[in-house]
Structure formats: structure tokens, C-alpha cells
Amino acid sequence: LKIDTQSFRSIIRGHKLQGDKLDEGIKGMFDVDVLCEPSDFKVCLIHTVPYFTGAGMMGVHIIHNVLAHIEGLCVDYCYLPESTVRKALKSNNIPLFGFGTKIPLREFDVLGFSMFFSPNVCNMVHIINYAQIPFLAEQRGEEWPILIAGGVLNTAPEAIAPIFDVMFIGEGEEQVPVIMETIKKMKKEGKKKEDILKAVALIPGCYVPRFYENIFDPSTKRYAGYKKLWDGAPDKIYWQKVDISDPKYNYTIVDYKKDVARNRLYLTKDVEVTRGCVHGCRFCAPFSWYKPYRERNFEGVKEAIKARQDMGTVRMMGLTPTDYSRYNEARDYAISLGIQYDGYSERIDQFERTWDDNRRKKSVCFALECANAEMRRRVNKHLPDDVFWAAFKKAIGAGIIKTKVMCMIGLPFETQKDVIDLHNLMDEMWRVSREIRPMSAIELSVNLFLPKPHTPFQWAAHRESPWMADFVRIYNEKFNDGSYVVFDEKLGRNVVKGWRNVKGSPAGRRLEALLDRADRRFCVPMIKTILKFNIYSEQDWGESNSKLWVGVKTYMQIHYGYDIDDTLRELEFDTPFPWDIIDVGTNREFLWEEWQRSSKAHETEGCNFGCANCGVVSKYPQLNGKSVCSQKKKWFDESNPSGVLQLAPDQIKGGTNG
């Protein structure tokens, strides 16, 4: 079965909704054909965002590049359809299909979902619904595709675990081809789904939820751990990490001149130069996920830059791309080819080093995180006040049009003084910018803190800052009373040249925290509520998720006698976490020690200054001697075959860590 594209185009046009980005959506769905042979093993990569948002995501390109080289495997793609297309699908009972092949998703062998952000869960539910596929893995027999989830959302998988047959944990370049080859071979041999999933469960990084079940405390109704339902299942699932310095990973992502099918996944200007980070902010989950810090070899970076010569622009990508040891060489190489270099948010302490790039920008973005030095010590953000102000003044003085500063509110150990300091920071930013360059634009972006699994703050309670309402009120008063207004001579009127941007509604962030800490009981009520209120992540995340929160809360109370507010409480050291089955490499004892150090406002030095014995190096021997995390020291040798660091307490930067 293939969808008749001409007929469907006509149907879509008849359902055009005002404000819908229909042209982009139709371009993604119909401009290119992906040809599959009848005998091909068919895989569709599903991205839980609209086409115009997701087509440039690097993870999309990496996995597509890996799969496109497997013989006898046909790779298609699908995105969340635009609202007009969704209306047409529903009204005409047409199942959602692969954009390239026009084959309904339910007829593929494997559907691979990219799960990167908590709000994407809403879109994922709708995609499965429009594909006319049963939601729960236990409802899908032999005739249905195998559903696989990939992406960082899988580090806390239990809220969506009942939906998927397989959840891949970590970096996929090495193991994703193994997974597909295994399924392809066994399906060709006529093996049952149960046998296929048992084989996949033994592939590193593969979590097969059906082989485990949650355990609950009968008295408190709280999550109490997990047990295996099949003895052959792994006890833990380890996040997969790849040695990106290996030349075999030197890919340009797509050859957009030759490969028509992948041309729809247009060449992104991003060039990955690093994975991981050495700085150790305690709120940052990617710091734990992507440890240890690794760098791509320079020849691979040059190859990727050159592939973007016709684009005219390139951007180095990584958690902290300016840490790349050959950053300046890569930038100069791009310039020598006539390619304009762009950048992400700047590390304030490296602003001087990258000044040649920054002074040409129209805007810069500084991640300050906290308004005062004590709170920055608590979150382990190694940044003195004078370094920030030096960078801020230099940016304003250089004529950069907009300078954005990002901070958080609702952090552990936060006091009202810390919130007052945010207001003072805003006033000082305004005063300094007026003195240096009166017409410069400044922006203070404030996000609500979220305690993330696998970080030192995973034990923290998720709370709405008791001062959040006051903070927003004072913000509004300052803008309404003219505090931030100047007279623009060109326009001949008063204008606001600094502006507020408070992101992350309390309701939305509360729901994200719940999804991180949720167990499998939450899955069904979540699906029911998303469908009932027709919730998408592109909507007002706060307003929509107030409904979703109430719906899930009511269901859990009625069916399980459990108050979901209890899920967001502060946790003890030995509290069982729903994500305990996932091991990203960092020891629990190390994270607890960091949590205690945060309570005392004590910093721990970054991995580039010394090893704090977090546990990663003992679990990933394939990265032995290739990680800046341990100063490229070979921890695995004849005298220390286990790789466990044998350090005295005074040798550990920042204190002992179990």
C-alpha cells in the first residue's frame, strides 16, 4: 500500500488552516521519493517535531548516515505533520506514512523515534495515533513494526517504557547498525518477535522494557525498584560512548549534491568538534551523559567544514565547542575557504580567546546561570563576577547589537536574597550598557530550574520558587514604569532597549520533572490525557500541561491511591530511582558527594584540572588514553587492570567521592 500523493495533496489544500506552515510541511512530505525494493528491510526514522524544525538536527543526520550504508535496508523519515495535514489524515482515515516512500508507518519493519525533549512525548503519542498503531508494546503482535526509541530522554525511560519494544541508551554510531542487522536477519529467518527482542536485549545499550517490571512499596505506593522477568536480560543498561577521534567517524553527515533521498535532510551548518564537557555544572545532565570529554580528529573536522563551502557558513558544535584544542585552527581553515563562522552561546571565561569571532557577531549569549558568586559555587559554575563584567562590557563596547544573559531561578538552596540579586543584576546590566552604548539591546533570560536524573541535583525537590511570582511582578513593574526606556532619535519616540524573557512556566516545568521521575504507572494516564485535550508540544506548554497534570494526578489517585506530588519531593541517598537501571558511567556516590558539596557552596574543579574520581574511566576501556577528562592518561595498564582510580583523598580535586 502506498498513499496516492496527488489525491492527498488536493485533500490537504482543502483543509488549509490559517497560519499553518503548510508549504514547508508539504515540501518535506512530497518533494522527494525514497525508492524501496519489495525485499528491502524498511526502517522509518520518526522525528517528534515538525519538518521545518527537525530536518536540521544533527542526531537525525548521524543515524541516517549510519543506516544508509546497510545493504538491503531502506531508510525513510517522518516528522510531526502540520495541523492542516493532521486534519486531512483524520478526516479521511488515512494512516500517517513515511514522507519518502509514501508507505504507511504501520507497514515498516522498524520505526525509530528520536526522543530528545520532554515535550516531545506529546507529539510522539499523536504520531503513533495518526499511524493507527496500538500504543502499548504488549498490544502489538507479530504483524506490527518494532518500535525503538533513541535520544537522551531514554536516560529516565520508565514513563514511556510501556510504549516501546526497545529503548537505545547513548551514542548510536556503533550499535544502531548492529541492532538493525540483527532484526533484519532474524525477521528474514522467520523468528518470532520475542526471540528477536531477546537477541536485541543482549546488544550493548539496548533496554527492552518487557523483560523487566517495576516494584512498588505496598504501604507508601512509591517506586521501590525493578526486577527481571527474563534471567538472560542485563542487570543494568550502560550508556554507549563512542571514540569520535577515530577516523571511521569522519563523516560529513550527508552528500547533499549526490544523494537525493537524503537531500530532504538538508545539510546542517553544524560541525561536531567535541562530545562531553570538562566543567562540571551540577545541574547539567549532558555533563554526566557525555563524560568523558572527547574531541574529533582535526582531519575529520576539516573534511566536514569543506563539505559546507557552498553553504557559506559553518558552526562548530559541542557542549562547549570553544574548549576544542584546535578551535582557532578550525575557524581559520573555514575563513580560508571563504566560509563565515558562526557560534553558539559563549563561555564567558573564554570570551577573550574567541574575540576575533565574537566581534563580528550581531549578538552574543552568556550563560551566567546565577546572579551572585555564592550560587554559582553551589552549582559549580566556575565564574568570578569580574570575569563576567569584563566580557559584558567588551561585548557592549564593540557594538554588538544584542547581549543576552541566561540565568535560572528555583535552584536548590536558593534564598530570597538570590532572587533580589537577579533584579540587581538586571539593573546593573542596564546601567552599564547605557554608559557604554546607550542604544545597545540587552536581554536577561530566566529559566526555571529542573532537577535532572544522573546529576548531583537528582535528589533535589522540584519546587516552584516561592519568589517566582514576586520576581515576575517586579520585572513587569520596571518595564511599565519606564525604568528601561530611552529616547530613540531616529524613531523620534521612546523605546525599550532591554527586555525581559522569563521562560519555562511553572506548570510546564513541573510536568517535565514528573516525566523524569515517573514510573510505568504514569504511561497510560499520560496517553489518555494527551489525546483527550489534544496537547502538542508546540502549544503553550504551561497552559496545556496544567490540564495534563490534573488528568494524570486524578487517574493516579483513583487507580493507585498515589499522590503524584510525592514524586517531586526531596529524596534520600538510598531512595530507589526509576532510572537506576540506566548507568551513564557516573557513580552514585560521586553524585551524592557533589550534592553535599553544593549545600556547603563548595566547588569541585573541572576534569581538565584534575580527576574527581566520578567512576567513568573504569567503565569505558575503549576510551582509554583518548579522553581529556583524565588528561589522556592511560588508566588501564598492567598495574591497574580494572581502571579504578587509586587516589588518596588529598589527590582528589574537591574532596573524596566514595
Report residues per predicted region.
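Glycine-rich beta-alpha loop elements in corrinoid/cobalamin-binding modules
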Residues: 82-229, 456-506, 512-519, 523-534, ...
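Radical SAM enzyme core and accessory elements
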Residues: 1-32, 39, 45, 482-658
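N-terminal [4Fe-4S]-dependent radical SAM core
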Residues: 8, 13-44, 51-52, 209, ...
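A glycine-rich phosphate-binding loop feature that marks nucleotide/adenosyl-phosphate handling sites
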Residues: 199-209, 319-324, 346-351, 441-451, ...
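Canonical Radical SAM [4Fe-4S] cluster-binding loop centered on the CxxxCxxC motif
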Residues: 57, 262-299, 609, 613-631
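Conserved SAM/AdoMet-binding glycine-rich loop
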Residues: 45-49, 302-443, 447, 451
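N-terminal pre-triad scaffold of radical SAM enzymes
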Residues: 43-49, 67, 254-285, 448, ...
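A short beta-strand-loop structural module common to alpha/beta enzyme folds
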Residues: 72-84
